[in-house]
Each structure stands twice: as C-alpha cells, then as structure tokens.
From Swiss-Prot:
Any one GO molecular-function label of the UniProt entry: RNA binding
Gene3D superfamilies: 3.40.50.2300, paz domain, Ribonuclease H-like superfamily/Ribonuclease H
Name of the protein described by the UniProt record: Piwi-like protein
Species, as recorded: Dugesia japonica (Planarian)
Family, similarity comment: Belongs to the argonaute family. Piwi subfamily.
Domain Piwi: 501-800
Amino acid sequence: MEIELIRKNLDGIRIERRGGLQKRFRIVEPDLQPNETKDKIGNVGKVVRLQSNFTKFSVNKSEKYIMYDTTFSKMGLSPKLKLQILVRICKEYNLPGSFCYDGRRLFTSDNWTEGSDIKEFTIDEKKVSLRLVSTFLSDTEEYYQMINVLLNNLQIIMGQEKIGKGYFLGSNSNKDNVVKNIGPTFFETNNFKVLGGFGTTLQRGTRPNGQLTTLLYIERINRVLNDNSVLVTYNRKNIDQLIGRDILTKYNNKTYRISEIKEMNINETFEMVGRTLSYAQYFKERYNINLTTEQQPFVLTRVKKIARRDKRKEHNENEAPEDMDLTLNITGELCFLCGFSDQEKSNIDLQKNLGCVLKRGPRERLDDIPSFCDWIKTNNNSQGMSNKWGLKIDNTPLEIEGRELPHCDVISGGQRINEKIKDDWKFGKVQFNVQKGVKHEIDVVIVDRNDSQYGNFLNDVEYEIKQLRFDAKIGRVLVCSANDVERSLNDVMRSGSGCAKIALVFVPDDRVYAKVKSFTISTGLLTQCVTTRNGTNRNDKRRQVVSSKTVMQIFSKFGYDPWTIDIKMRPTMIVGMDTFHNKGSKKSIHASVFSINSTFSQYMSFANSPKGKQEFHDTLSGNFKAALTEFKRIYKILPVRIMVYRDGVGDSQLQFTKQFEVDAMKPLVENIYKENGCQVPQIIYVIVKKRIGTKLFNRGDNANPGTIVDKEIVKPNFFEFFLVSQRVTRGTASPTNYNVLEDTRYQNKAGIIEAITPNELQRITYTLTHLYFNWMGTIRVPVPVHYAHKLAELIGKVHKGSTPALINERIRNRLFYL
C-alpha cells in the first residue's frame, strides 16, 4: 500500500541518482505537460524571422559541481561582505576551481573540503564553516540555480546592489556617480529616481531539431524610488493610499510592504535577544543612524519567519517547527516609497518625463544584450570571476522562427468592421443586435455636483443612442450627496416602469465608486460609472470618446453583443479564472467566469474567498455545476469540451496547481456528467502568464499582432507557446505565455481519441482576444481571463478584505464589471 502511494505521488517526476558523498536522490524539474503529448508545434500562418531578448551562453564544463552550506561566526554581515570574505579565503587558502555565492549557499567547481563533509576557514578572526550539501552535474536544476547566482555575483562585483529581487544601482546613486553610455541607466526628475539594472535568467530551450539548449535572458530593468520618505508624505487623510505600497529602507536595501501605519515615539522600547532597546538606540547601534523626529509615523510590515528545520532530529511532520508571522516596526523617516500612487500614475506630465526610461521602444531594447556584454568586458572588477568560469555570452540577440496567424474577421450587423491590415475598429461601424420590443431606460445619479454641469455629456450619450438606433431614453436625473448615493440607487430600483433599467452614476472618487458597485453586486441593479472629471470635460473630442465608450458598455451590460467572431468548433464552454490578492489584507478573491453562449461573448460569473483546499474544491464544484446547468438549459446539451484559461499562477506554483486544482477539478466535472448520463468532456487547462520578461521583435520593430512562437525559447518539459495579440503605439509589445497543463483528449463518434492540436489551440486563443467589449481592438489575453481579472479586482477593491457578498442572480449572467 505504501509503495503504491509513493509511486502515485512521484508519477510524472523524473528521478536521477546524484553523485557525491551523501548518495541521496535528486528530483529533477517535473514534466508539466499533458500525458502522451506528441505535437506541440503549429504550422498555420506566415513564417517570419524574429529576434528576442535571449542569447547564447556557455561556461567551462566541470565533471561535477558542489554545493555547500555556509555559516559565518560574525552575525549581521551583508551578502556583499560575505562574498568579499569568500574571495579572500579562495586566494589566501589557494582553493581550486571557481565559485559563486547567494548569501547562504556556496557553489564551487572543485572540492573545498578535501574529502570531509565540514571544514572551517579563518580570515581576520572571522570564522567561516562550510558543510557539504550535495554534488550535481551540468544541465540539472542545481546547475541552472548556480549559473543564475554567478550572474548575480558579477553584478554585485560591478557595483550593483540587491533591491528586492533584482540588482540595481545603489539607492544613494546620483547623476554625478553613474557611468554614462554603458551599463545600468539612471534618471532623476520630480523627486523620483529611476535606478537601472539588468535582469538575467538562465533557462532551457529547444533547438529547431528538438535538441536541448541553454539560453540566457537579458533585459534592462528599472526600480522607481521616491526621494521623499514616508515621514514627509504621510498625513492622517492618506493612510488608505499608503497601505499596500512597497517601501525601501536604504540602510539595508530591503523592500517591505506597508501593512499598517501607526504614530509612535522613537524612544519607545522593544525586546531583542534579552535586551530592552529603544528604536533610536537600535538604529544608532546597528546602522549608525541618528533619528531626528521623536514622534513620527512608523511603518508596520508583516514578514514570515521561516523556521529552521533540523532534518536529523525530525522524524515526523508534527515535530517540525512552524513558520511564524512577525510584525516589524520601521521609522517613517527611513522608509522610501517605491513605484507610483494612483494619483502619480494619472499625472500626465510626470509619466511623460519618465516615459523615456520606463517605456523604451524595440530598437532601444535590442541594444540591451550588447550593452550588458560590453559592461562586463570593460569592467575590471568582473574580469577575474568571469575568466575563471570561462564565461562566454553572445552579444547578439537570438534569432528565432515565428508565425503570423491569419486575420480574424470581426462582424457587427452582418458586416466586417475591421480592416485586414489592422487589429482595431471604429465605434461608428458597430451595430448592436438589440432584442425587438424591449425598451431601455437610463436613470442618472449625480453625486455632489450641480446637474447642469453634465448637460453636454448627456447630450452626447443621447446622440450615440440615436446613432445605434436603440429604443432607449434617459430617464430621471437625481442629485445626491456621497452619503446618500445608496438611497438614490434604491429610488432608481423602485421606479420600475417595465423597462430594462440601468443607473448612470457620476462619481467623484473611489469611495463613492465602491459604494455604487457594492450596491450593484448585492441588489442586482446594473450601474455604469463615469468620473466627475470625464462627465464635465469641456474638450468636445475627449468627452465624445468617453460618451461613446459609455454607451457601448451600457448596452453590453444589458446583454447585447456589439460584435462577434465566428469560432467554428464542437459545443464548448470556455472558463476564465483569476485571483486578486488584496495588498492590505490576507484575503484573496478567486473569480471564475463561464461562457454560456456559442459566440463566447456572455458569461456566468462567480467570486469566492475560500479558506483552505476543501472549501476551494467545494466552491469550484458548485460553480461548475451551476454553469453547466445553465449551459444545458440554454442548449439542451452539455458541452463536449471545457477549456479553462487560468491566470495568476507562477512557474513555482505549477506543480501545486496541477495537483490541487486540475486533478481536483476533473473528478468534479466527471461526476456532474455521470449524473446527467453524458460522456465525460475533454478538459483543457491552460495557464496564462502576462508578467514575463520575454520580448519579440520583427526587423527591429514590435512583432505584429497574431505572432506565435512555439519553439526554441520554449521549455522542453512544457507544452507552451508565446502569442503577441496586441499592438502598442508607445514602448514595446509584450507577448503572453500560454502553458497547457492538462488535455484529457476527446473521443469522437468513431471511437478515435484526439488531443487538441497546437493550431486549433492557438487559433482559439488569438480569436478570444478580439471579444473585449470595452475596447475596439485586441487585448493581451483571452477575454474570459480578462473578465475574471476585472471581476476579482472589482470584488477585492469594493470589499477590501471583508467577506464578499454573493453576486445577485439578476446580474450573474451579465457583464456588470465592465
């Protein structure tokens, strides 16, 4: 029984014996693709030659590599100082081979402990102990970790500092001490610093002939830092805007997230290792910093302390120490905000000033690889380490083969409304297919303003309605204060006149917006919000653009499609899933949307905040059952294929997602189909990743929408592809990564079992990027994923950590979150 359980848990994972003294087994990266996957490369579309931000890479090969755990006798040393000590040890003890160090683990190409497991070295009365952990070969997971550590060490040696997870110019850099025209960039304006750096990652790739290869990803990265401390920017009225923001503490270059802000005195005390210290004492003794303001805001940040586990003493899981959540109190004058607030993001002048650094074009990005190579070659500090390792980096971007998928015809009113050379279309060509005999009424709610200021906007709305030939009118106009907005919305609900009704609400701020949307979710009254700024805009062109989008959103919420795309395939339900993590709370909102029509334009929506795996499975089961029941009510059959697009999952979470989401979902769906006496459907589960560093270029410019790459830069153990679906007018277009975790395959009437082909999957995915009814063009991800994201974000921001209300059944099948 135990052997079978072990075999089941290790199914799909390749295991190899590792060398070295301990003779243990090493788990290699699992094969995260559907069973019996044979064909992963498509062939439809025009073949194009592309460039990427990957390049070829090599180091001197060794028979084996060794990993050590390090212990330093002196506490509190920074990784940079530890690295310098290890460099001295290597020289003074004449240790063989090359090495790199990540702050805890030491990787070497030769043995430093001379046959024993543990050895101790001494430099300037500082003792360093090495304990052998493992030995490994090249082209293993440990090897890739080691090379990534080597590249990080090179950046430290060349003067970079670790800030968060990346390596950048130091936080105290200024324009006078930054080398120009080579290496990391630096920019300063409006109390903001943009600290430059390089992101580097080694990963597996596949050559055109199918052989494995090693590729190096290189890209310039930036960190935006506000020169004003939290002490300067803080006031009691803006606490909500600061909660959830990231801060940097310059004394140790660490980043934290603000969980809470509390006014305290720097002479207040706390316990630390048997001593009672004031905050002023602590920062003076530890960092030689004199705090200047006695009473000031303190940033409270929650961090997880990982318990140190001694595997030699632990015999079962109950004996293992538990991780703990700790709260750190940091004085506001030492905390500097990272990134932008919502107000700063909407500051056009500020974003324009920083755009030259943050939104670089494709031709500038193509220079990243040669710039990084030149920086290493011309930096004297890096030569010793790079020469020892035999480091070779090709200074030209990797050329790869891609394809441009055929154009999709966007249909509205029976006619194609998009041009074949473009990926967007105009509002004037849109014709809604409105149900005859149904009247529509739009009641207006104006918050904290005089109704006469909105006359021009309402006239624009009426004009757009006439252009679209809707049987609709603007009804009552209600004016109220922010505190009475729910009462006015109740008046709109009670004034039922046999019409399909929606409330057009002009909101002055996010607080009122949250009230309106909370009312929508709980009562089922459709609402369309417009900001006060847009509703009172005196610029005719800008106001008319907003009014046309507003009308399109209103009638999309009524359940009408402004356009469609013909997707010919067997009866299919497409599901979008995403998770919203509230920065100021531990609660997460899991949203899922299920297509309930053949054109994949209308969706049934669910939002849950499950606690634990069992509750997640229960809510997932209930959501699938309700959506499949609705699908059957409409079409009299259940779908023969279910395609799930799942966002919000990183590479490190793929194994967990496959085990606890995919493998749990399959029996849930099977049970529902068996209860209905139907054949189990084909289930396809695709992970969608937007936040990736990969860039694709076509002849020095952005890749065209519809560009697919499914070879060379894809991982050999994944069934994945990259798709550029959106055109950008400024900066560089980013592809989206799609990774197929599961395909249960389909059994046709002849009994033949078929997997989805790469061509079909890529075509469906690209087509679904055309169906977002808040933008007359393509978007970066398939529309169900984007709708799930919009829904999760709306619920998360409205409820801010509290348990979300159930979505009212009146709007569950409507796009109320547009």
